[in-house]
């Protein structure tokens, strides 16, 4: 399955009331896609799904956190001319690229994946993930938050690096070096809009946000625009930088 096909499949409704999911369409798609994969659901909270490979080989992990809640009244994904996609993509864009990496086994065994709710309000999904992993005595050595952004669109970047919080000098250096050696265009925004990274940082977890650039109002029912050819590059960015972090901190 191509990433664009996954994107169309996961651009469906998912809502919560800050305490639990109330609309679960996207959850059902994710669970179905991963049912025959190398991943198992190791944690199900009221506002999160936590996946890991079978079994979790290390009590020290790199976490990827991608929120699945949305604010739209209607959801859609359409392909326009010149390789432009239009749709309600906050946050199905990063969900789809992450799922592709999981389905094609591009992530290391000690990478744990969390799909979270309530990001649009209080990030209670991310907070629940931290509580659940802590109860299992699993240490989050580094966290990558995935989200969409208005940064980097004019520069035609397929990804951005934002909100680096609590990242030690050596790990940060290795990530930026990997980005430069890769050669894909990107922008770095140290102090960006608030997202789940702020909540992980409050628990002293080193983190950054890896964002997918879009154009337009990301919360509009009319949708926003993004470049289709960025899908495989963003997907590769997730796999590439999580591997760098794993080598640096585990």
Descriptions of predicted regions:
Residues 8-58:
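A non-catalytic alpha/beta surface segment that caps or lines the substrate-entry region
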Residues 9, 32-33, 174-183, 236-248:
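Generic non-transmembrane alpha-helical segments
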Residues 36-44, 79, 181-189:
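Short secondary-structure junctions
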Residues 41, 113, 143, 207-209:
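Conserved beta-strand scaffold positions in the cores of enzyme catalytic domains, especially
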Residues 49-93:
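Catalytic-core environment of secreted peptidases
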Residues 71-73, 85-170, 176, 184-199:
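Acidic/histidine-rich catalytic neighborhood of metal-dependent amide-processing enzymes
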Residues 103-104, 215-250:
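His/Asp/Glu-rich mid-to-C-terminal helical/loop segments that flank catalytic regions of hydrolases
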Residues 189-232:
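Functional cleft and adjacent loop/helix regions within the main domain
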